[in-house]
Amino acid sequence: MTAPTAEALVTLQDLEAAADGLRGIAVRTPLLPVDALTERFPAGVWVKPEMLQRTGAFKFRGAYTFLRGMSAADRARGVIAPSSGNHGQAVAYAARMYGVA
């Protein structure tokens, strides 16, 4: 395995831009405490129910962000997601939001 290059590392600025682009688009899913597990472990245990997200999975966030970052010309060429699972559903849903086939 090779070490990532500086260009490949995700920055705080990248994360903030992605969050800004998803505001009003992605469902803001809650953080829920799991009291039964918190009682057993020395730290609080929380879950984020991403099944409440569009397409039922967190993968929508990445798919939408990726399409948002594409140029209109590239989006017009279409997208392919070699998956029939959560990733494929998320890409298809995000593509439909952009009018992409």
Label every PLM stretch briefly.
Residues 1-101:
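PLP-dependent amino-acid enzyme catalytic core
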